[in-house]
Amino acid sequence: MTALLIDGNALSKTLRAQAAERAAALTARGHQPGLAVILVGANPASEVYVRNKIKACEDNGFFSLKDAYPDTLSEADLLARIDELNRDPKIHGILVQLPLPKHIDSHKVIEAIAPEKDVDGFHIANAGALMTGKPLFRPCTPYGVMKMFEAHDIPLQGANAVVIGRSNIVGKPMAMMLLDAGATVTICHSKTRDLAAHTRQADIVVAAVGKRNILTADMVKPGATVIDVGMNRDDAGKLCGDVDFAGVKEVASHITPVPGGVGPMTITMLLINTIEAAERAADAAA
């Protein structure tokens, strides 16, 4: 059996077309959705991510603003800029590209973003709202994964799901969303004693640790759905995920590729979150 590929590019195209329609409707009402992206320093990967986010905005009728600063920017100046954007009615979403330079406290920066403009869903108010089943914004990567399950009719209710990784950005919110959908969820991480014992029982495995080949074919239950959130480089410098794709695709029923899987969905859900923020702001102003 060869797994069915869950194509993130194709699903993104459909969802972005829907986002563009909603953006056009809002713009016609005088409320073009606006996203501000802040980049501090010259991290090459961060520069690529920011460029892709700005391009996605431009391609789908969003207003976008990119603030790029040297890594010498002070924390106080960054917080002051966020305060300005919080009060700017043209901006509905604010995203600070992580990681930040060491002298800037990323937790403090995230908490400075107004919760109603926190389209990454990282603010403590939004994390708490997700935890209690009343999310304002869902973090973009796990939200994109949930859309993939939905598009491919992958049953979650009663399913055994293993999430490998416990970050605030992917692992923890992913587990909460699966739990809300009725799955029985196990979170595994670097201190987990026998990872394979957990993954072999799983109907769904989400790998999100940033470690190549953490999941191999012998660790996967036949017919499982495998979602690869990892972004790594192989020995030849080629982009790859956390999953041994060649081996696992012969065992799983569904699998996401890297690249072209979860990556494009993350930016798509950023657009969806920004649209939702803009729609709420427009309704409040009406």
Curated annotation (Swiss-Prot):
Indicate which residues the UniProt annotation says bind NADP(+): G165, R166, S167, S190
Stated EC number for the protein is 1.5.1.5, 3.5.4.9
For this UniProt record, give its keywords in alphabetical order, as a comma-separated list.
Amino-acid biosynthesis, Histidine biosynthesis, Hydrolase, Methionine biosynthesis, Multifunctional enzyme, NADP, One-carbon metabolism, Oxidoreductase, Purine biosynthesis
- Which pathway does this chain act in? One-carbon metabolism; tetrahydrofolate interconversion
Q: Which SUPFAM superfamilies match?
A: Aminoacid dehydrogenase-like, N-terminal domain (SSF53223), NAD(P)-binding Rossmann-fold domains (SSF51735)
Catalysed reaction, written as an equation:
(6R)-5,10-methylene-5,6,7,8-tetrahydrofolate + NADP(+) = (6R)-5,10-methenyltetrahydrofolate + NADPH; (6R)-5,10-methenyltetrahydrofolate + H2O = (6R)-10-formyltetrahydrofolate + H(+)
Q: Example GO biological process term?
A: tetrahydrofolate interconversion
Q: Which GO terms describe its molecular function?
A: methenyltetrahydrofolate cyclohydrolase activity; methylenetetrahydrofolate dehydrogenase (NADP+) activity
User: HAMAP family given for it?
Assistant: THF_DHG_CYH
Q: What does this protein do?
A: Catalyzes the oxidation of 5,10-methylenetetrahydrofolate to 5,10-methenyltetrahydrofolate and then the hydrolysis of 5,10-methenyltetrahydrofolate to 10-formyltetrahydrofolate.
- Indicate what this protein is called per its UniProt record: Bifunctional protein FolD
Look up and give the organism this protein is from.
Burkholderia lata (strain ATCC 17760 / DSM 23089 / LMG 22485 / NCIMB 9086 / R18194 / 383)
| Gene it is expressed from | folD
